[in-house]
């Protein structure tokens, strides 16, 4: 239709409006099954609704990846619908655009959210276990912890004379036979090590090592001295004590007695000129009475 207003030509187009079908013939149960019930586009009940049967726009809706009808869910009218839905015709949980409509609602994911993402910060995080909880010291307690020493670890007056063999004892090497020097050097080094770590228990493996080394050098000495030697009873007493004590070292007193017996065995080869004779007289007296070195006990007369 063309209208003229002065020198202006106006073209007016009219579009026929489709009259709405009367809903009077529908039963109330068909129009509204329950208060607040609404059929959403894209649902199986939307296409079968009497109002939309003749509408070509909703006759065939394309199946979108976000909406797929699960077989068997909507076949039964009494079916509860999708999991988590309030009614038999609940809207799809996925947020897809169906027939020009968009559902603004957002459902919480079923999987565990990332606790470090900002959008999931409202989710409850796992509780900290008791074994990982930080223990707070009680009020009034000191903020720092002092190491507590066992009084038994402190050196006593009885232990003050332990391990007298030091670096000066290495001067004996030049006066010992060549086959005795390695053993004596080992004895001095172990004595220095134990003196520096007197607060810790002596290592048992060290005592066993000294026992093996002592038996080796004693066997070599016996093979080289087939004839009777005046040193035989003294060295026999020393090696017997070493063999017995070596596997049983538990305290520093045990290790001290073992080392002094080993050094005494070595220094017997220059007993007349040894500068440590007074030291052995103090620390090795137990060897003579323990193994019968000396005059045999006299049998008391019968009458």
UniProtKB/Swiss-Prot annotation:
ZnF region ranges: unnamed: 262-274
Disordered: annotated span: 20-97, 134-160
GO molecular function terms attached to this record: zinc ion binding
Basic and acidic residues composition-biased segments: 46-62
GO cellular component: host cell nuclear matrix; viral tegument
Localization of this protein: Virion tegument; Host nucleus matrix
Broad class of where this protein is predominantly found: virion
InterPro entries assigned to the protein according to its UniProt record, in alphabetical order: EHV_Unk (IPR000714)
Post-translational modification remark: Phosphorylated.
Pfam short name (any one): Gene66
Name by which UniProt lists this protein: Virion protein US10
Taxonomic source organism: Human herpesvirus 1 (strain F) (HHV-1)
């Amino acid at each position: 239709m063309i209208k003229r207003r002065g020198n202006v030509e106006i073209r007016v187009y009219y579009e026929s409006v489709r009259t709405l079908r009367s809903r009077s013939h529908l039963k109330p149960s068909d129009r509204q099954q329950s208060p607040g019930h609404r059929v959403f586009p894209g649902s199986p009940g939307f296409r079968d609704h009497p109002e939309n049967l003749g509408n070509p726009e909703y006759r065939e809706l394309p199946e979108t990846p976000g909406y797929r009808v699960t077989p068997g869910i909507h076949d039964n009218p009494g079916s509860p619908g999708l999991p988590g839905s309030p009614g038999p015709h609940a809207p799809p949980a996925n947020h897809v655009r169906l027939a020009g409509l968009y559902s603004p609602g957002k459902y919480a994911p079923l999987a565990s959210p990332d606790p470090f993402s900002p959008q999931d910060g409202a989710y409850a995080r796992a509780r900290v276990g008791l074994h990982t909880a930080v223990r707070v010291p009680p009020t009034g307690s000191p903020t720092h912890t002092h190491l507590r020493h066992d009084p038994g670890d402190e050196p006593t007056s009885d232990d003050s004379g332990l391990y007298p063999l030091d670096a000066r004892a290495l001067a004996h090497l030049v006066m010992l036979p060549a086959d005795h020097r390695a053993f004596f050097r080992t004895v001095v080094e172990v004595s220095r090590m134990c003196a520096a770590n007197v607060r810790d228990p002596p290592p048992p493996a060290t005592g066993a090592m000294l026992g093996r080394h002592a038996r080796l050098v004693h066997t070599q000495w016996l093979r080289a001295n087939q004839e009777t030697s005046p040193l035989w009873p003294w060295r026999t007493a020393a090696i017997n004590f070493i063999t017995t004590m070596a596997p049983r070292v538990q305290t520093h007193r045990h290790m001290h007695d073992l080392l002094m017996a080993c050094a005494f065995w070595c220094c017997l080869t220059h007993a007349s000129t040894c500068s440590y004779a007074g030291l052995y007289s103090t620390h090795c007296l137990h060897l003579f009475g323990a193994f019968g070195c000396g005059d045999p006990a006299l049998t008391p007369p019968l009458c």
